[in-house]
């Protein structure tokens, strides 16, 4: 239970290597070097594969699950392109995803078909519900309505099963990770999120935005994400 919040408040979600056109590797030794030694972050495949491998070494039964993300404007990601994680502890399933940009810093129990167990966090209220016997949905309460963040299949996947999705999100011009910079991490006050244009500091009730420039982006990277890295499009 302690490993997940520690990981999330230490390791940012970020796609800087995609923006810098540095190849993505999900080899576990490369991930350890990047995230633990170099103190970087990554996106879902990197963060969740490393965290799943850690949990497996601790004796947990972890499943890498293919999920489809719902975007706030009503769109959807390519089918199964997000890698979610869940663990089975004595017959109860818990989402242990550390590689999604909007998650609480605690595990989320997937309750029974009739009982939903909300998870309360500085950034909002979350729950996991069954869609059918083979799928679950992660949801967040927004303006008194439960909104689906993603739907995932229970079927176990290997990291190799995501190779085409990783390639899409690393190279395809339609991929959000190719088109945009996204760095986000839980904070003591809520969450910090940075793009090429703005830094947003938010929690469930407030939001403050600041302009990001070539002059201040490294300061923000260090202050909020503990990152010391150049982002090529910011550089002259």
Language-model features, listed with the residues they occupy:
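Short coil/turn segments at secondary-structure boundaries
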Residues: 14-19, 232-236
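Short clusters of hydrophobic/aromatic residues that line enzyme substrate/ligand-binding pockets
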Residues: 13, 35, 110
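Short, small-residue-biased leader/transition segments that mark boundaries at the very start
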Residues: 1-4
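Acidic/His-leaning functional-site neighborhoods
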Residues: 131-227
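Glycine-rich, acidic and aromatic/proline-enriched surface loops and short helix-turn segments
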Residues: 9
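Hydrophobic/aromatic-rich core segments of domains that either
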Residues: 49, 53-121, 125
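Short, conserved helix/loop micro-motifs enriched in His/Cys and acidic residues
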Residues: 19-39
């Amino acid at each position: 239970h302690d490993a997940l919040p520690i990981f999330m408040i230490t390791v940012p979600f970020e796609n800087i290597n995609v923006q810098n056109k540095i190849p993505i590797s999900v080899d576990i030794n490369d991930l350890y070097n990047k995230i633990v030694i170099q103190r970087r972050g990554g996106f879902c495949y990197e963060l969740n594969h490393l965290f799943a491998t850690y949990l497996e070494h601790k004796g947990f039964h972890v499943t890498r699950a293919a999920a489809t993300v719902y975007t706030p404007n009503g769109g959807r990601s390519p089918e199964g392109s997000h890698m979610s994680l869940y663990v089975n502890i004595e017959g109860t399933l818990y989402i242990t995803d550390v590689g999604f940009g909007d998650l609480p810093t605690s595990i989320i129990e997937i309750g029974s078909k009739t009982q939903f167990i909300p998870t309360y966090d500085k950034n909002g209220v979350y729950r996991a519900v069954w869609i059918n016997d083979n799928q679950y949905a992660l949801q967040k309460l927004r303006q008194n309505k439960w909104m689906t963040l993603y739907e995932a299949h229970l079927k176990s996947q290997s990291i190799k099963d995501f190779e085409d999705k990783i390639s899409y999100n690393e190279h395809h011009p339609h991929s959000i990770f190719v088109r945009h910079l996204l760095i986000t991490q839980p904070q003591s006050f809520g969450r910090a999120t940075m793009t090429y244009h703005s830094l947003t500091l938010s929690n469930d009730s407030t939001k403050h935005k600041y302009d990001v420039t070539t002059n201040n982006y490294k300061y923000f990277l260090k202050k909020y994400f503990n990152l010391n890295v150049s982002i090529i499009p910011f550089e002259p």
